């Protein structure tokens, strides 16, 4: 296993002493597998969202409910994973921690927000949501996010929250601060960027409080009955809450809402049981696959290590493929989903391999 592999989706990497240990690398392989599963779900979610918002999107109610179920848990998992190694990194000093998140979060956030938004602006009516203003959006990037890059913006903010709270009172202070900001965001109107960061802060804090070692021990020693039971409970919770989603939100209906509207339903407080159980099930599956050591596990682990390039570029590949298929071949709807997911994962990996060969990955924020 490469000691320079991209260990976490954003800026989170295991400390170098841990990376040099084969035993430790084996123990944390499930984290990369979880990240691999998670980034595939992210790509699938955005591919489904593009179909929902595109021509004929209202004719696929099953896809809408699948999108709703997916959005209840897949991003909270990434915030949890992002917190697992934070304490070790904080112990190396504030300056090193801040420098790392500036390089691995802030720089890619601005660079790829500008690249992607510029292409969207240039595409005009070919995209699902054309934009008319350019510079106003670019100038506002420090406080108003575009597309999927809200995750990097939110992760940067929760890292700052974690840094401040941890220096004050350790893990308990981080948990308390995260719960506090989430409660405030629930009752005090704020900007979308701040609300997204506050809403996901507890998952990050939970990962930070548990740490990768405790998490690995829990999943390594979990009984088969508990694994299966958690999965069944997650399935029941997601089915129940998704079936009642229209009653949870007066202004939106799953079968008519846009993808962003469905996402707002998925992120409602009432969906918390589905969020926790769905996320736990994903992690349990990742742990079981990592322990099996099969080809699927190895593939997912590799994808997990390269999840940052996939995250940064998948929308460009998905949108480009969908536009090409719709306008050239007149193919639209859910039948495009497998192709979009394959291109959304595979395209960025090809770009990453090419930039590695020419030594451009670092300057593009891909490593």
For each feature predicted by the language model, list its residue ranges:
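Alpha-helical transmembrane segments and their immediate juxtamembrane cytosolic regions
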Residues: 2-367
């Amino acid at each position: 296993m490469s000691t320079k592999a991209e260990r976490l989706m954003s800026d989170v990497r295991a400390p170098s002493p841990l990376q040099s240990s084969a035993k430790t690398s084996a123990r944390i392989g499930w984290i990369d597998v979880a990240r691999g599963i998670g980034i595939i779900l992210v790509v699938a979610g955005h591919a489904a969202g593009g179909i929902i918002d595109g021509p004929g999107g209202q004719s696929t109610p099953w896809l809408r409910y699948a999108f709703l179920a997916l959005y209840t848990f897949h991003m909270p998992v990434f915030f949890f994973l992002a917190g697992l190694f934070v304490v070790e990194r904080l112990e190396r000093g504030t300056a090193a921690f801040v420098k790392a998140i500036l390089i691995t979060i802030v720089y890619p956030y601005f660079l790829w927000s500008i690249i992607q938004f510029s292409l969207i602006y240039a595409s005009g009516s070919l995209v699902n949501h054309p934009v008319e203003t350019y510079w106003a959006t670019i100038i506002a990037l420090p406080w108003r996010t575009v597309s999927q890059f809200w995750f990097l913006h939110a992760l940067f903010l929760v890292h700052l929250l974690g840094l401040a709270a941890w220096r004050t009172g350790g893990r308990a202070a981080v948990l308390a601060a995260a719960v506090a900001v989430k409660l405030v965001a629930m009752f005090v109107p704020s900007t979308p960027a701040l609300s997204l960061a506050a809403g996901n802060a507890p998952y990050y804090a939970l990962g930070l409080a548990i740490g990768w070692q405790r998490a690995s021990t829990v999943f390594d020693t979990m009984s088969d009955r508990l694994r299966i039971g958690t999965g069944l409970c997650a399935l029941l919770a997601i089915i129940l809450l998704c079936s009642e989603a229209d009653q949870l939100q007066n202004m939106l209906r799953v079968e008519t809402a846009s993808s962003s509207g469905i996402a707002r339903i998925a992120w409602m407080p009432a969906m918390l049981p589905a969020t926790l159980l769905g996320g736990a099930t994903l992690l349990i599956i990742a742990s079981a696959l990592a322990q099996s050591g099969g080809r699927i596990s190895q593939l997912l682990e590799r994808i997990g290590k390269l999840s940052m390039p996939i995250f940064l570029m998948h929308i460009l590949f998905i949108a480009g493929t969908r536009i090409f298929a719709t306008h050239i071949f007149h193919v639209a709807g859910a039948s495009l989903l497998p192709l979009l997911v394959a291109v959304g994962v595979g395209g960025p990996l090809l770009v990453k391999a090419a930039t590695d060969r020419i030594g451009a990955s670092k300057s593009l924020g891909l490593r």
